[in-house]
Amino acid sequence: MLDSDSIDLILKDLKTHDFVFIALHGSFGEDGVIQSILSKNNIPFNGSNEESSRNCFNKSVTKDIVMNQGILSPKYYHTSSNICNDHIDFNSEKYIVKPNSQGSSVGFNVVDNFENLNDAIDIALDFDTSVLIEEFIDGREITVPILEDEPMPVIEIEPKSGIYDYKSKYTAGESRYICPAVLNDDKYLFVQDCALSIHKMLKCDVYSRVDFKFYENNFYFLEINTLPGMTETSLFPMAAKKHGFS
């Protein structure tokens, strides 16, 4: 954990540089904290500002903003307790349980029946103070990178397990990626436009990656990543390469 002395030492070093490229994931990196520190010290950095980063890292806040604009998203319940079964007002064949503010699918679980929700909630609460319980939407995993207010090639993700969890994201060979995704022209352009609209309504800057499920001819917004991964196997560079960037 960083204390104030550690932050002061880091800032002293950062101030000797012209620009800071943030390549952090999870808390401190994606939740607006480092963005706030850099902004207050007039240090330029990549990506979205403090407010946008904070809102986008908080999944329930993100969903509320997006759903209030009429965009489809899985029904959900936000809680800080595992005693919540009586309060969930939607039925689902399965349930997605995940920390409300985390990344990389840490603490993520798919629950096959209502009775097993509590165990999954306990796991998610190990990683955050609150949990999102979502309706399970079966369908194709679709993601749209955005760069400078322009949608990049759409990518479809095919996890071998059928669920795009931590293992599917970070273990070689566990997922197949199709870029560009095979969609008819109307749907392809629609999901690009939808992703760009979400990027703008959440006041993201420079770049982001917007995730969807495609089911029964509809796209359901899942979440947005304001600091997409930039490794050789990450999705954003894959789309950028297809778009013509070296």
For each of these PLM feature ranges, what is it?
Residues 1, 74, 243-246:
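Short, intrinsically disordered, charge-balanced linker/junction segments flanking boundaries
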Residues 1-51, 55-57, 61, 80-87:
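ATP-binding N-terminal substructure of ATP-dependent carboxylate-amine bond-forming enzymes
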Residues 10, 14-15, 55-140:
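Active-site nucleotide/adenylate-binding loops and adjacent lid/helix of ATP-dependent enzymes
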Residues 36-45, 113-118, 243:
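A glycine- and small-aliphatic-rich helix-loop capping segment at beta-alpha/alpha-beta transitions
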Residues 112-193, 214-220:
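Phosphate-binding site of ATP-dependent enzymes
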Residues 135, 199-232, 240:
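Conserved metal-phosphate-binding beta-hairpin within the catalytic cores
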Residues 162-168, 231-239:
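A short, polar/charged loop-to-alpha-helix boundary motif
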